[in-house]
Amino acid sequence: MSIKLINIGFGNIVSANRLVAIVSPESAPIKRIIQEARDRGMLIDATYGRRTRAVIITDSDHVILSAVQPETVAHRLSSKDEVNIDEVDE
């Protein structure tokens, strides 16, 4: 099994296998999702104090904020330059 990792900016990396959605933060429903995740303690802020440009939602209900454009994250997801970690069966 292969684990695909995606750079979401500033050296932060997430597992591509866990991503459900990559969305823009401007709409009211997404702002509500961010606030609810913050209240539940499920928000991960990877913006380093910069403007949030992408909101990444994972299958574990974590919400990750990134300063990278959603299109850039999606391009990295489909790119062949991903970092792959192969699990070795022992």
From Swiss-Prot:
- Going by the entry's taxonomy, the superkingdom of the source organism is recorded as Bacteria
| Lineage, uppermost ranks | Bacteria, Bacillati, Bacillota, Clostridia, Eubacteriales
PANTHER family noted in UniProt: REGULATORY PROTEIN SSL2874-RELATED, REGULATORY PROTEIN TM_1690-RELATED
InterPro entries under this entry?
RemA-like
Q: Which organism is it from?
A: Clostridium novyi (strain NT)
Q: Please give the name of this protein.
A: Putative regulatory protein NT01CX_2250
What family is this? Belongs to the RemA family.
